[in-house]
Amino acid sequence: MDWKKIDDDKYVILKNEAGLHIDKGNNLAGDLLIFDSQTLTIDKVNKRYADVPPKISIEVDVDVALDELTEHSYMSIKTEKLLGFGVEKVIWFLTASKKVMIATPGSDWQLRDWDKDVEILDGIVCNVGRYLKEKGSEFA
């Protein structure tokens, strides 16, 4: 995916486990969050958490200690929380299975191979499998 194609006047990108404050005592972190710049205005930015929903949430694998939940259960719960908070699209890239899960509100969630195009937003697509193959990665 070519991040340079994302209009940085229209969108704000937060990464590296950026925090979201869903409600009291309910905070989540995201690998990559894409906000509409009209939603995440400068007065909504602080040191801890964004309290407005991103337009897109992108996650790579489940990288938390799962005491009593399966990986699938954790993904489902987190995805439901994000969609309930107002996120328009949640995308999970899963390296072990080489799959991508895409969830949007009011629609069936999709699971596809990661060598298929995935629209992130505004016609910008990501194809992890193709990218890795082009780079000669053994993980393609």
Report residues per predicted region.
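C-terminal interaction segment
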Residues: M1-V12, N16-A140
